From Swiss-Prot:
Residues 32-51 are annotated as: Disordered. The active site is at S96. Residues 32-47 have a biased composition (Low complexity). InterPro entries: Beta-lactam/transpept-like, Beta-lactam_cat, Beta-lactam_class-A, Beta-lactam_class-A_AS. Belongs to the class-A beta-lactamase family. Residues 1-26 form the signal peptide. This is Beta-lactamase 2. It comes from Streptomyces cacaoi. Substrate binds at K258, T259, G260.
Length: 314
């Protein structure tokens, strides 16, 4: 079995994992209502002995070693408050996963009528990886259509046009600060924000911080109910997530995710809300990069990290 092989390969790895947090437990609001912003439970070691390391840490460390990467994972069961946290407070490039949060901010800022406003742009505005916007230079696109393109197709030009409606990267950064996120640093637009270099803090966040932001928009009370449903629909119908978190969850679980891919260092991300038929949703963020500029990352890594989370929280 896959997980047995991983565990056996890392019996000696646990002692080296002093940075890995432990599981936490807490109580949440009713499943019938949106969660208040900022209601996510924080990690706690109260139920564990000092220095005790969770078994899942060895499995995630094994994946780091097998794929020769740096891996960050944060997941929370929004019903029980239990967490899986591995390098969850360390910085990683967020790449295109920000587009889910950007569209949450756009929905929050604009009325339904404003979301139907057509945005005009020219060929000069087009950047790489713009499969939807490149087809609508003549007629333009509504804010709703731009969000659909940004979240479901990771369209870079759509993301840049949406940036203009929320005050640019700095404006979105300030919006996230309003959610309690004082970690994320947003500075550049596409495609430059995906060109991360080791040691840089520009356009980075932590697995925990970005997951909490996604939770606030999708499950919290930041957005009106109709806007939450719209963002959820975009995420659930994402076209770029096959082989990532979707490939690692259990049968019957429904995933709404946003992926990200960096230009260098094999940087790869997937961030999701996962709805289970027999429990409250999970919120999961996996962030990865390699150690060399030309590194290539196999998407299997994110799927297998998701399997570890599913085993622990499922």
């Amino acid at each position: 079995m896959l997980h047995t092989r991983i565990r056996r390969a890392t019996l000696g790895a646990v002692a080296a994992l002093s940075l890995v947090p432990v599981m936490a437990c807490g109580q949440e609001s009713s499943a019938d209502a949106a969660e208040p912003a900022g209601s996510a439970p924080s990690s706690s070691a109260a139920a564990h002995k000092p220095g005790e390391v969770e078994p899942y840490a060895a499995e995630l460390k094994a994946l780091e070693d097998e794929f020769d990467v740096r891996l960050g994972v944060y997941a929370v069961d929004t019903g029980s408050g239990r967490e899986v946290a591995y390098r969850d407070g360390e910085r990683f490039p967020y790449n295109s996963t920000f587009k889910a949060l950007e569209c949450g901010a756009v929905l929050d800022k604009h009325t339904d009528r404003e979301m139907d406003r057509v945005v005009k742009y020219s060929e000069d505005d087009l950047v790489d990886n713009s499969p939807v916007t490149e087809k609508h230079v003549e007629d333009g696109m509504t804010l709703t259509a731009l969000c659909d393109a940004a979240v479901r197709y990771s369209d870079n030009t759509a993301a840049n046009l949406l940036f203009e409606t929320v005050g640019g990267p700095k404006g979105l950064d300030k919006t996230l600060e309003g959610l309690g996120d004082h970690v994320t640093r947003m500075e550049r637009v596409e495609p430059f924000l995906s060109r991360w270099e080791p040691g840089s803090k520009r356009d980075t966040s932590t697995p925990r911080a970005f997951a909490k932001d996604l939770r606030a928009y999708v499950l919290g009370d930041v957005l009106a109910e109709g806007d939450r449903k719209q963002l959820t629909t975009w995420l659930r119908n994402n076209t770029t997530g096959d082989g990532l978190i979707r490939a690692g969850v259990r049968q019957g679980w429904v995933v709404g995710d946003k992926t990200g891919t960096g230009s260098y260092y094999g940087a790869r991300n997937d961030m999701a809300v996962v709805w289970r038929p027999d429990g409250r949703p999970l919120v999961l963020n996996v962030m990865v990069h390699g150690h060399t500029k030309d590194a290539e990352l196999d998407s299997e890594l994110i799927a297998r990290a998701t399997e570890v989370v599913a085993d622990r929280l499922g």
